[in-house]
From Swiss-Prot:
Zinc finger (C4-type): 66-83
Assigned keywords, A-Z: ATP-binding, DNA damage, DNA repair, DNA-binding, Hydrolase, Metal-binding, Nucleotide-binding, Stress response, Zinc, Zinc-finger
Protein name stated in the entry: DNA repair protein RadA
BP GO annotations: recombinational repair
Alphabetized InterPro entries for the sequence: AAA+_ATPase, DNA_repair_RadA, P-loop_NTPase, RecA_ATP-bd, Ribosomal_Su5_D2-typ_SF, Ribsml_uS5_D2-typ_fold_subgr, Rubredoxin_2
Organism classification: Bacteria, Thermotogati, Deinococcota, Deinococci, Deinococcales
Length: 503
């Protein structure tokens, strides 16, 4: 038996070998192996890792992606280490198209040409993005002036809250002015949409399709170049070779493909997104980074609030107020009057407060009720406000105004169903609780705002001038506000505020 040093590669023409490997001396560095077989015999096949990677079939690597924030892991995790979400990981098997043109390439919401070309900032022209008015003033307010050509807007909200109704009204307004509207119906039949359109009084002719393949939608945008494209919903859009519809990869890559098509064709595009049980848009968080604008539609009492949380073409935090009626979502032009319409007069514990929700000033009613407690420990119930701030205000009233609250249950409510974490409501809470305890109602023409500190001082708040202007438009002549506001004397402490109200 002789030891033979043999250089191998992966092809073989031996009669006894079905793997296709044969000795090859003229290939250097392919791998040196010592065989103890007799030289005339066929050399057995050996697996040579790394000698020729093209001969191997690569092992499919499975990733797990958090459907909340897009965090990737090699194994499923119970809790995402990035966003702390529980049971949010979904399996994703990379396909051939994942690294291709429909994959992660160009995920950002930009419309530039790919490549290595550099452009100096000084040579870039200055121009405003053209806007298309939606025909609904409250929606235009939230979007910053209207729909931007080539901009992509993501609208989220609970099922049945009115997303499709609002967008069908917008489509009617745009089409009635001569613009072409493409409506992609992924969840409803065309007959169902026709019935809703008849109920809403939609008279314009819309171009509709039920084809939810992202490649085909992009082709329609390129062919027709509509003024507005509505996709209802993004969770029904599919991309070839990217897994099941509604999955992380489908939603991510479908959004990226439609965004690129919208930028290239200059089409204002609106994507409808489902929400999870905690109120966030279903799908990977990267989807919200791709789009230009993200707005949410939520229910507050009898009203619908449209709130922007991201806007590349305007100011985020804008708020629009709507009311659902038989003819659709109707814009509420004066939210302050709407929220104060049912306010009782001459009742202790009721105060009109000037607040700011997002970027919009409005007047709301702060209510307080104090009653003797039958329990050893008095209760504190807060609705619509920050409970910790209310506890601070109650402590200030006890310490600085000698108001006894230890044996009283105190209830504080922000009427209307809104939840506003505004420090400027502190003074309204203080006066409402004081009014409820002493049993004296505030005058009808008084509105207040201001932050209360631990020393009992009244501090200034953001957007004080806009708050005062909103109160003036509503007819409130007396303002109890912090010092420093033009035309107003201002109060420096809670004690001064009490004296100013009941002077």
């Amino acid at each position: 038996m002789e030891r033979v040093a043999v250089l191998f590669r992966r092809t073989c023409n031996s009669e006894n070998c079905s793997k296709g490997r044969r000795p090859l001396r003229e290939r250097p560095l392919a791998g040196l192996f010592f065989c103890s077989l007799p030289a005339p015999l066929s050399i057995p096949c050996l697996s040579l890792p790394g000698s020729n990677p093209g001969d191997f079939v690569p092992k499919v690597k499975t990733n797990y992606i958090c459907n909340s924030c897009g965090y990737q892991s090699a194994k499923p995790l119970g809790r995402c280490p990035n966003c702390q979400a529980w049971n949010s990981f979904e399996e994703e098997v990379p396909t051939a198209s994942t690294s291709g043109k429909s994959g992660r390439g160009g995920l950002g919401g930009y419309g530039g040409v790919k490549g290595g070309k550099l452009t100096p900032l000084s040579t870039v022209g200055r121009r405003e993005e053209p806007r298309t008015p939606s025909g609904i003033p409250e929606l235009d307010r939230v979007l910053g002036g209207g729909l931007v050509a080539g901009g992509v807007t993501l609208i989220g909200g609970e099922p049945g809250i009115g997303k499709s109704t609002l967008l069908l009204q917008v489509a009617d307004k745009v089409a009635s002015r001569g613009g072409t509207v493409l409506y992609v119906a992924g969840e409803e039949s065309l007959e169902q949409i026709r019935l809703r359109a008849d109920r809403l009084g939609v008279a314009a002719d819309l171009q509709m399709t039920r084809d939810t393949r992202a490649e085909h939608i992009a082709a329609l945008l390129e062919e027709h170049k509509p003024a507005l494209c509505i996709v209802d919903s993004i969770q029904t859009v599919t991309v070839e070779g990217e897994g099941a519809p509604g999955g992380v990869a489908q939603v991510r890559d479908g959004t990226a493909m439609l965004t690129r098509a919208a930028k290239e064709t200059g089409t204002a595009t609106v994507l409808v997104g489902h929400v999870t049980k905690d109120g966030t848009v279903a799908g990977p968080k990267v989807m919200e980074h791709i789009v230009d604008t993200t707005v949410f539609l939520e229910t507050v009492g009898a009203f619908r609030l449209l709130r922007s949380v991201k806007n590349r073409f305007g100011q985020a935090g804008e708020l629009g107020v709507f009311e659902m009626r038989g003819e659709g979502l109707i814009a509420v032009d004066n939210p302050s009057a709407a929220f104060l319409a049912e306010r009782p007069l001459d009742v202790p514990g009721s105060v009109v407060a000037a607040t700011v929700d997002g970027q919009r000033p409005m007047l709301l009613e702060v209510q307080a009720l104090a009653s003797k407690t039958p329990y050893p420990n008095a209760r504190r119930v807060v609705v619509g406000l920050d409970p910790r701030r209310v506890d601070v205000v109650l402590a200030v009233l006890e310490r600085r105004l000698d108001l006894t609250l230890g044996g009283l249950d105190v209830y504080v409510n922000l009427a209307g169903g809104l939840k506003v974490p505004d420090p400027g409501l502190d003074l309204a809470v203080a006066l409402a609780v004081y009014s409820a305890v002493v049993g004296r109602a505030l005058p009808q023409n008084v509105a207040v705002f201001g932050e209360v500190g631990l020393a009992g001082e009244v501090r200034s708040t953001q957007m004080a001038l806009r708050r005062a202007e909103e109160a003036g438009r509503a007819g409130y002549k007396r303002l109890v506000v912090p010092p420093g506001l033009d035309g107003q004397a201002g109060v420096k402490s809670v004690e001064e505020a009490v004296k100013a109200v009941w002077r």
